Amino acid sequence: MDEDGLPIVGSGIDLTKVPPIQQKRTVAFLNQFVVHSVQFLNRFATVCEEKLSALSLRIQQIETTLNILEAKLSSIPGLEDVKVEAQHISESNISNGHLPSQPDAQSVVVSPQSDNNSMNDGILQKEEAKSENITTVSKDPRYARYLKMVQVGVPVMAIKNKMIAEGLNPDLLETPDAPVPDGEPEAEESSDSESSFSD
């Protein structure tokens, strides 16, 4: 015995005289543990399934939006030759965990207009040498606004339907450097329409 009256070695209890644990209580404890564990796992699985279904729905929405965007971009002529310079991220920024969320406007260079302008300049020079007085579709004010709509990304079918409603030839959208079928009257009509706006 030590100072507190406790045995130095062992508990001092004769284990042969201790009554056994009741089996019914042991079974009840085990059953309760199993039930709580199963309920927890069921709740966890349900929450995971809900989050995965929400994520799947969000991915489907993004895919649909991406398909619409690709369709709009494919309707713009001349984007096949667009060159985009990849943004170079320094390794120090990556190691520090600083990743830019959006590329800077200066780091990404998209030049569809410059490519289109260079191609159009060559074609325009040839056509100007052949005929200087012929009005092209791109110069005609009635067709120019529809060509601008195509460049902005408005769906081509909607533009063609609007052109048909206004009595214009929608096939001329694909050939902006072609001569206007009724050249001079269009210039007169456009000047009339401009004067009506100025009044």
From Swiss-Prot:
One of its GO terms (biological process) is actin filament polymerization. The keyword Coiled coil applies. Residues 183-192 have a biased composition (Acidic residues). Residues 47-76 form a coiled coil. One of its GO terms (cellular component) is WASH complex. Residues 93-136, 170-199 are annotated as: Disordered. InterPro entries: WASHC3. Keywords: Coiled coil. It holds the Pfam family CCDC53. The keyword Zinc does not apply. It comes from the Eukaryota. Residues 93-120 have a biased composition (Polar residues). Belongs to the CCDC53 family. Component of the WASH complex. This is WASH complex subunit 3. It comes from Xenopus laevis. The gene is washc3.
